[in-house]
Amino acid sequence: MKVRASVKPRCEYCKVIKRKGVIRVICSRTPKHKQRQG
């Protein structure tokens, strides 16, 4: 999980979602692409 100021989908499998007011990127294919805005 990377914590970044700016989160972007890194591949076609990345999804941008909002949980409890925090923007996150989850990826079904490459778990390394997981990100959270912070």
Swiss-Prot record:
Q: List the disulfide bonds.
A: none
Q: Which domain of life is it from?
A: Bacteria
Ribonucleoprotein found in the keyword field: yes
What biological process terms from GO does the record include? translation
InterPro entries named among the record's database cross-references: Ribosomal_bL36, Ribosomal_bL36_sp
Q: Which UniProt keywords apply?
A: Ribonucleoprotein, Ribosomal protein
Instruction: List the Pfam families hit by this protein, alphabetically.
Output: Ribosomal_L36
Q: Name one GO molecular function term.
A: structural constituent of ribosome
One GO cellular component from the entry?
cytoplasm
Q: Which family does it belong to?
A: Belongs to the bacterial ribosomal protein bL36 family.
Q: Which NCBIfam families does the record cross-reference, listed alphabetically? A: rpmJ_bact (TIGR01022)
Name this protein carries in UniProt: Large ribosomal subunit protein bL36
Q: Which organism is it from?
A: Chloroflexus aurantiacus (strain ATCC 29366 / DSM 635 / J-10-fl)
Taxonomic classification, please? Answer: Bacteria, Bacillati, Chloroflexota, Chloroflexia, Chloroflexales
